[in-house]
Regions:
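Nucleotide/pyrophosphate-binding catalytic subdomain
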Residues: 1-243, 248, 416-418, 437
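Structural motif
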Residues: 2-3, 31-34, 108, 127-128, ...
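Flexible loop/turn segments at secondary-structure boundaries
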Residues: 12, 42-43, 137, 171-173, ...
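Terminal amphipathic helices with adjacent charged low-complexity linkers/tails
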Residues: 36-55, 211, 260-277, 332, ...
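Acidic/polar loop patches that form or flank catalytic/metal-binding clefts of enzymes
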Residues: 244, 255-262
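A conserved regulatory-domain signal marking ACT and ACT-like small-molecule sensing domains
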Residues: 269-439
């Protein structure tokens, strides 16, 4: 059994968390390769190291004194080092880092949280330190060079029986540091798992896996013990944020299960993510997730269905503004484009004006204040009446549905409702498919 074991920011936030990590790693000999994030928040009011590094970079760019920021960063790392009794000369490394800020770019600066954390963890565990910049290779288009990366990872594994690896970054062919999106440490772990064809990719965080609904809305929602990659993609896209959604792809390509576990409660079962799951699931649905902050643009044109390329012409205008489209529900004479408010804050009316002037529809209507809620489940297609049950429950609870979208694989039913109905909608769906089914 060979595992890649990744610990998120909350799992390495201070010396106490480091001790938990050591206990977890040493309890299983197959946890040979460890990936770490930068230290996260110790309390709700605390700062993540990565946030502080972005702030430090902003001070650098605008030539503002950053001594207060560097002191906080220094104190965080040195408190971990000193409390654990580590011997490395971290003070010297930090001094050199802060002294060379003017020569560094943003990616180099913000990646140092993972870098210093991994160096501390390597000494604490007695493992080798392997720098991600020497292993993960980006192409110039910012995609992963899998051939080069796989060779480098396998060479490091051949050299070291155990190592600690910083997440979140790699380098390009010119040796320049390149980062993943925020939360990208999860991607780093998945890349290592793919490159060595690991038996399992463990992702340790501060929650015991995925829940069927947001616990801020639904009281004590059921745990999801098993979920498919596809289901997780659907839920992650709609806001279920335990694992970075792009971490799924490298593991999925080699059919490597991902196990979400809780550093603070290592005895909990967590959630296992895999390609397919045998047997009957306890409920018709797997989970519910959603997001607020959407606008729909309704385009109506009589006999639209007879006009070749009509929808494409509208979409090409939207594409000109580089706006991602969430859904395109349609009928014979009309269709709607659902987009995130954040993507059209300053361009919505200009874009709508172009649609009116260039495409000449009978009318265009915009509606803001829309929320999207997705109900996801791999077995929904095998249970006739699932969508009717969902719509009926919302109707009987006086929730008006503005939009409906269902994937062709019948794994996901998405409804659009008023933002003020968001919490109520999630609760009603949960009660319909989970609470009532338990009785």
């Amino acid at each position: 059994m060979l595992k890649i074991t990744k610990f998120g920011g909350s799992s390495v936030a201070n010396a106490t968390q480091f001790k938990k990590v050591k206990g977890i790693v040493e309890s299983d000999p197959s946890r040979q390769y460890v990936v770490v994030s930068a230290p996260g928040k110790r309390t709700a009011s605390d700062n993540k190291i990565t946030d502080l590094l972005y702030l430090l970079d902003a001070h650098r760019q605008y030539h503002v004194d950053a001594s207060n920021v560097t002191k906080i960063i220094r104190d965080r790392f040195l408190s971990i080092k000193n409390e654990l009794g580590l011997k490395q000369n971290l003070e010297k490394d930090l001094d050199e880092f802060f002294a060379n800020l003017a020569k560094m770019n943003q990616a180099e600066i913000v990646s140092r949280g993972e870098y210093f954390c991994a160096k501390l963890m390597a000494e604490y565990l007695g493992y080798a330190f392997v720098d991600a910049a020497d292993v993960i290779r980006f192409r110039m288009d910012k995609t992963i060079d899998w051939d080069a990366t796989t060779k480098k990872v396998q060479a490091k594994c051949a050299k070291y029986d155990h190592f600690v690896f910083p997440g979140f970054y790699g380098s390009n062919a010119n040796g320049q540091i390149q980062t993943f999106p925020r939360g990208g440490g999860d991607i780093s772990g998945a890349i290592l798992a793919r490159c060595i064809n690991a038996d399992i990719y463990e992702n340790w965080t501060d929650v015991s896996g995925f829940l069927m609904a947001d616990p801020r809305i639904v009281k004590n929602p059921e745990q999801i013990t098993h979920i498919t990659y596809s289901e997780l993609r659907e839920l992650s896209y709609m806001g279920a944020s335990v694992l970075h959604e792009d971490a799924i792809f490298p593991a999925k390509e080699k059919n490597i299960p991902i196990h979400i576990l809780n550093t603070n409660r290592p005895q909990d079962k967590g959630t296992i993510i895999q390609e397919s799951i045998e047997g009957e699931q306890p409920y018709a649905i797997t989970g519910i997730a959603g997001k607020r902050g959407f606008t729909s643009i309704l385009v109506y044109k009589k006999h639209m269905s007879n006009e070749v390329g009509y929808i494409r012409k509208v979409l090409s205008i939207v594409e000109d503004y580089n706006v991602p489209i969430e859904h395109i529900p349609s009928s014979i004479d009309s269709f709607s484009i659902v987009i995130a408010d954040s993507d059209v804050e300053d361009i919505l009316y200009e874009m709508v004006a172009r649609i009116k002037n260039e495409i000449k529809p009978d009318y265009v209507k915009t509606k803001s204040g829309l929320a999207l809620i997705s109900t996801v489940g791999r077995n929904m297609s095998a249970k006739p009446g699932t969508s009717g049950k969902l719509f009926g429950a919302l109707g009987s609870n006086h929730i008006n549905i503005s939009m409906i979208a269902q994937g062709s694989d019948e794994m996901n039913i998405t409804v659009g409702v008023k933002e003020e109905d968001f919490n109520k909608t999630v609760q009603v769906i949960y009660d319909t498919f989970v609470t009532k089914e338990k009785k």
